[in-house]
Every structure is written in C-alpha cells, then in structure tokens.
C-alpha cells in the first residue's frame, strides 16, 4: 500500500521519524465507500502510522460533552479500541484542535474543565495541547487570519498541566487499558492493569466532588 511504501522510503532519508496520521470520522469513511471510493480505517492506517488523531470517535465525544449522548456511549467505544487495535496502539488525545470548539468554551465550569483535562492525560495515547489551551482560551481562532494569542488574557493552568504530564510519565501505559462511565453520577473510571503494575484514575466529569 502507498503509506507503507512511503514510510519505507522516508526511513532511508529520515530514520526514526514519527508518523502522525489524521484519519476521518466514521461517517466520512462510510460515505466515501458507499460511492465506490477507497477510505482507510484507523486499523489500516496503524499499519503505517505511529499515532492517529481521535477523529474516528470525535462525533461521540461531541455528543457526550454537549449532552446529546450519555457518557458511556463514547467511553464504551474508547474501551473497545483496546481490543480492536494492536495492544501498542497510540491515539492522539485532545479536547480541542484548530477546527473544533475550544475546551474552555465546551467546559465553562472550572471543575469540569480540569477533570476532563486530567482524564485526557490519563488516557492511553499521546496528549495534544492546542495553542492557548494552557491559559483556557475560549475563542476559536481563524484558520486564515493571523490571531496572536494573548498569553496574559486567560487563566494560566500550565502548572496543572505540567503536574499531569509528570503523572502520565509514571503510568504503566504498556499494560491493559480499560475505561468505563457511570452515567448517573457523571464519573469515569480508567485503569491500567498488568502483571507488573496497576494504576486507577477516577474522574468526576460532571464537576461534582474534588
């Protein structure tokens, strides 16, 4: 396939490059295939790419965070990825990106924003912070106009993010990852379990508790 050939060619001139792929929503794959066009699933792309964007499940993330779907709808799908992909799969974990709603706008309550941010770091994969997320920027910048970030214009949570990054580096991420949601309480429990280590995180995504 093209991407495998491309990777082998790049390896000759740029060894050990990290390949990040931006896959598409499941609905887009279905639409393309229904018209007779090729569209790669995440499973196919992982044969060439090291990390993939979380866009396969992004509509579910938007649904649960906007109150249109129960929490479990998204987290059950995330949990299934642990057995549908190779055990060493690496998903990009983010709450926002250049063409999506800002996390600070999506979660205006501080406790919710901090809980979702902590969960994002705990989940299996590589964390993406988008420009200004460190200071809780709510405005989504234009893709076509220059809009410098006012680094003094928001609440600085960079120390909190640094602490989460330190914790993430200590997690046994090579072990089995599981995640589940309690819809009634708005709580998500995530864990890494294996013969060598175990770690559990409990996240009050509804903004209740500490």
Task: Label each region the model flagged.
Residues 181-210:
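Carbohydrate-binding surface patches
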Residues 1-86, 91, 108, 119, ...:
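Active-site-proximal helices and loops of the catalytic beta/alpha 8
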Residues 128-135:
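Short acidic/histidine-rich active-site segments
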Residues 101-107:
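Short, solvent-exposed helix-loop connector elements
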Residues 172-182:
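Short secondary-structure junctions
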Residues 113:
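Conserved interdomain hinge at the start of the Helicase C-terminal
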Residues 102, 124, 168-172:
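Alpha-helix capping/termination and helix-coil
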């Amino acid at each position: 396939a093209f991407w495998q050939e491309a990777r082998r060619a790049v390896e000759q001139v740029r060894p050990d490059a990290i390949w990040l792929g931006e896959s598409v929503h499941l609905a887009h794959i279905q639409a393309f295939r229904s018209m007779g066009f090729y569209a790669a699933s995440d499973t196919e792309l992982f044969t060439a790419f090291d990390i993939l964007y979380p866009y396969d499940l992004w509509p579910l993330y938007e649904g649960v965070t906007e109150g249109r779907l129960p929490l479990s709808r998204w987290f059950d799908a995330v949990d299934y990825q642990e057995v549908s992909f190779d055990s060493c799969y690496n998903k990009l974990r983010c709450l926002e990106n250049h063409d999506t709603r800002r996390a600070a706008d999506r979660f205006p309550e501080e406790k919710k924003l901090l809980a979702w941010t902590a969960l994002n770091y705990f989940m299996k994969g590589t964390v993406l912070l988008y420009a200004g997320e460190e200071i809780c920027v709510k405005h989504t910048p234009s893709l076509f106009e220059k809009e410098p970030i006012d680094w003094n214009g928001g609440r600085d949570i960079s120390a909190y993010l640094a602490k989460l990054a330190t914790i993430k580096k200590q997690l046994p991420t090579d072990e089995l990852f599981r995640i589940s949601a309690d819809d009634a309480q708005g709580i998500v429990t995530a864990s890494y379990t294996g013969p060598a280590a175990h770690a559990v995180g409990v996240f009050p995504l509804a903004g209740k508790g500490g």
